């Protein structure tokens, strides 16, 4: 955002935010919103409302990330500045208390490096709000914090060596340099996904099925961002979504996965199967259904023929070099 190129920045955000679940990018977006809405010059309170909405938007999308701790801490600092006095008796004081308590409850349920610091803040917050009720609230949340803290330690071990790059790499051919390392990355991603599926945070049992699904969906989005050219990961993500009632997300995984890997037979068959199942729902006749199902296979064959032509052209060039 150097040179005050705000229109360009907003264009980048509109194109990339919802497709790139990266804490760094979302932090830049949040800083941009805060820069454009100065809280020091906010007589109407509109700027604070805009920033508050931005925090909600960011945390709803990447707040489950283990690297989102700094954003959560910044958010709590922002909430301390809203009108009202913790421990006060006015309606405004009570409103601020409820907002901050809800935010702390969300934060201490996320396995991240700052969870212990946030827990200490929460204890101080409840004590300053009401010493008589502080013990009750702290005891209620203590098991969640202990589970979260332990989960963070496990995730830290799982993430050791994991490449969460937003720049995807083509899988090296078997026997070529980097092939074994790439497969190791695939296994690390699978290990993280398996851990999330095992529900070590006890979310489903505690009635937090939506959070459980949100966490897994987020991990799958992270995985296909790095393993963009690994078809099996797209298929795994889609099938998990279909098994858990996330039809739209499952369809998006198959559509995006096939767009990224048009030469993948696996994705072509899975996508065609999806189209075949959806055709009756869309009221299509036999001919239209046949055309819809055929489209992925046409795309697959075109992509494979194109690859074949590229290989032949490369061989011809190499042959010319040898003859020279």
Q: Where are the model-predicted features located?
A:
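Polyampholytic low-complexity alpha-helical segments
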Residues: 1-324
């Amino acid at each position: 955002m150097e040179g005050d190129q705000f229109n360009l920045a907003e264009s980048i955000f509109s194109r990339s935010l919802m497709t790139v679940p990266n804490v760094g990018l979302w932090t830049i977006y949040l800083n941009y919103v805060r820069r454009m809405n100065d809280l020091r010059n906010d007589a109407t309170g509109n700027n604070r409302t805009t920033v508050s909405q931005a925090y909600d938007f960011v945390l709803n999308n990447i707040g489950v990330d283990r690297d989102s701790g700094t954003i959560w801490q910044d958010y709590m600092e922002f909430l301390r500045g809203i009108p009202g006095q913790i421990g006060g008796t006015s309606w405004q004081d009570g409103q601020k208390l409820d907002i901050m308590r809800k935010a702390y409850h969300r934060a201490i349920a996320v396995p991240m490096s700052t969870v212990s610091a946030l827990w200490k803040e929460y204890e101080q917050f409840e004590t300053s709000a009401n010493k008589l009720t502080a013990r009750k609230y702290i005891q209620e949340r203590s098991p969640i914090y202990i589970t979260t803290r332990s989960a963070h330690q496990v995730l830290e071990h799982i993430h050791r060596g994991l490449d969460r790059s937003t720049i995807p790499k083509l899988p090296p051919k078997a026997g070529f340099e980097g092939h074994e390392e790439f497969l190791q990355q695939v296994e690390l991603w699978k290990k993280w996904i398996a851990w999330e599926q095992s529900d070590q945070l006890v979310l489903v049992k505690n009635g937090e099925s939506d959070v459980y699904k949100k966490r897994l969906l987020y991990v799958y989005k992270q995985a296909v961002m790095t393993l963009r050219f690994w078809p099996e990961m797209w298929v795994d993500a889609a099938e998990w979504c279909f098994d858990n009632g996330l039809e739209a997300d499952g369809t998006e995984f198959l559509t995006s996965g096939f767009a990224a890997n048009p030469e993948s037979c696996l994705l072509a068959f899975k996508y065609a199967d999806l189209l075949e199942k959806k055709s009756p729902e869309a009221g299509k006749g036999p001919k239209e259904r046949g055309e819809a199902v055929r489209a992925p296979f046409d795309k697959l064959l075109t992509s494979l023929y194109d690859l074949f032509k590229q290989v032949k052209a490369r061989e011809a060039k190499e042959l010319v070099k040898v003859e020279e």
